[in-house]
Design a protein with these regions (language model features):
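Helix-loop "lid/cap" segments that line or gate small-molecule binding pockets
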Residues: 38, 58-74, 131, 162-163
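Surface-exposed amphipathic alpha-helices with a cationic face
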Residues: 104-111, 183-188
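Active-site neighborhood of HAD-like aspartate-dependent phosphohydrolases
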Residues: 2-52
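Metal-dependent phosphoesterase signature
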Residues: 45, 67-105, 113
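Substrate-recognition "cap/lid" segment bordering the active-site pocket of phosphatases
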Residues: 96-98, 118, 124-175, 180-189, ...
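Short acidic-hydrophobic, aromatic-tinged amphipathic segments that line or gate anion-handling sites
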Residues: 213-217
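Short, basic, low-complexity termini and linkers enriched in Ser/Thr/Gly/Pro
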Residues: 227-234
């Protein structure tokens, strides 16, 4: 059930910049399986755990990182083809995707408390749009996808663009993500990083990557918002 913000709630200049997959929607493992299909179609065979370790970075970097592990090389055209195959495969898995516990309540709470927030994802709009619809996110919410920036995570471009769209300083922003790539990007952007365990990374990994706090999922973060700058006015 949605929690109502306390009377007198305020956020100052604090804004929240959310990753999408594994942070707001339970879609990481569907992406893993979709990537396995795409890679196998290209004659590249990898264990799913190796694929999982790279989820969260941009598709191009993702392909390069996995190919480095296997010793394969592909052309830019083939790398683009693998990304298209992934998007097609993910479309077949998306019916299994659900919002993570507390995701809708967390976003509704921040909206009611007038805390600005945006979504910044390394996914392209084709796959991200499928997940965004599950959350019922309104059209006026800034959504920054891989298509809109030069470099995706672990570069800071996505979060910098999201902060700019909100009209806030990146130093006044809290980046919420489930992967080490989210938190490395947050650190490089000079934002406060908060990790969630809902994407499969461990607490220590997220802390080493720069997480100020680590919570189980959006519902857990909602219960502890005062720890990251959203609190009652004194």
């Amino acid at each position: 059930m949605e929690t109502e913000p306390e009377k007198g709630m305020h956020s100052g200049k604090t804004a929240f910049l959310f990753d999408l997959d594994g942070t707001l929607v339970d879609s990481v493992y569907q992406h893993v399986l979709a990537w396995r299909e795409a890679l196998e179609a290209g004659g590249i065979h990898l264990a799913v755990w190796r694929i999982h370790r790279q989820i969260g970075m941009s598709g191009g970097l993702f392909v390069n990182a996995l190919l480095r592990e296997t010793g394969h090389t592909v052309s830019a055209e083939e790398a683009e083809r693998l990304q298209r195959l992934h998007a097609e495969a993910y479309g077949r898995y998306v019916s299994q995707v659900r919002p993570l516990p507390g995701a809708a309540d967390l976003l509704a709470y921040l909206t009611a408390a007038r805390v600005p927030w945006a979504v910044a994802t390394s996914g392209r709009i084709e796959s991200a749009g499928l997940s965004l619809r599950l959350l019922g996110i309104k059209e006026d919410v800034p959504i920054i996808t891989r298509d809109l920036v030069r470099h995706a995570k672990p570069d800071p471009d996505l979060f910098l663009a999201a902060a700019e769209r909100l009209g806030v300083e990146i130093s006044d922003s809290v980046v919420v993500g489930d992967s080490i790539w989210d938190l490395l990007a947050a650190r490089r952007a000079r934002a406060l990083g908060v990790g969630l365990l809902s994407g499969g990374y461990g607490r220590e990994e997220l802390e080493r990557a720069g997480a100020y706090r680590v919570y189980n999922d959006p519902a857990d973060l909602l219960r502890h918002l005062d720890e990251v700058g959203v609190r009652s006015a004194e």
